[in-house]
């Protein structure tokens, strides 16, 4: 039984796009693992297993798990900053209203997905 070879996951995807996609998969996997289980759940193998990539692709994007965790932190903090900026921009000119909107945005951001709070406020290594 000979058939045409099955296309690979990355067939037809340009190299730079493949790398970016794999990096995003690794960051998302690390977010889930760290967010659910803390730093103890994070290893090169666990991240690669979580996203279905081999370790070669891990080291294509990151030097070590500290580097990866920094990327997770950067992504989550950028999302928080965007939420706070949007909330404060829509709160009017009053400093009090803008402050309340910013605080509410931080609390809402963390409570909407508690893993975000864990990444930002607990367990995190110094990055």
Where are these regions (language model features)?
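Basic, helix-initiating cap at the start of DNA-binding domains
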Residues: 1-37, 46, 50
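A short, mixed-charge helix-start or loop-turn motif at secondary-structure junctions
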Residues: 8-15, 62, 66, 87-92
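Charged catalytic carboxylate motif
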Residues: 25, 79, 98-102
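Helix-turn-helix
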Residues: 25, 33-67, 71
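Hydrophobic alpha-helical connector segments
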Residues: 71, 85-115
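Short, basic, alpha-helical segments at the C-terminal edge of helix-turn-helix-like DNA-binding modules
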Residues: 73-81
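Short secondary-structure transition hinges
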Residues: 108, 115-127
């Amino acid at each position: 039984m000979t058939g045409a070879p099955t296309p690979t996951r990355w067939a037809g995807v340009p190299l730079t796009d493949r790398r970016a996609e794999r990096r995003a998969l690794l960051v998302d996997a690390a977010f889930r693992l760290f967010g659910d289980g803390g730093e103890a759940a994070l290893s090169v193998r666990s991240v690669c297993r979580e996203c279905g990539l081999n370790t070669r692709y891990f080291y294509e994007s990151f030097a070590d798990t500290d580097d990866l965790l920094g990327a997770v932190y950067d992504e989550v903090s950028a999302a928080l900053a965007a939420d706070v900026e949007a909330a404060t921009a829509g709160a009017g000119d009053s400093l009090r209203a803008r402050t309340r909107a910013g605080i509410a945005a931080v609390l809402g951001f963390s409570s909407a997905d508690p893993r975000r709070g864990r990444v930002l406020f607990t367990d995190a290594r110094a990055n």
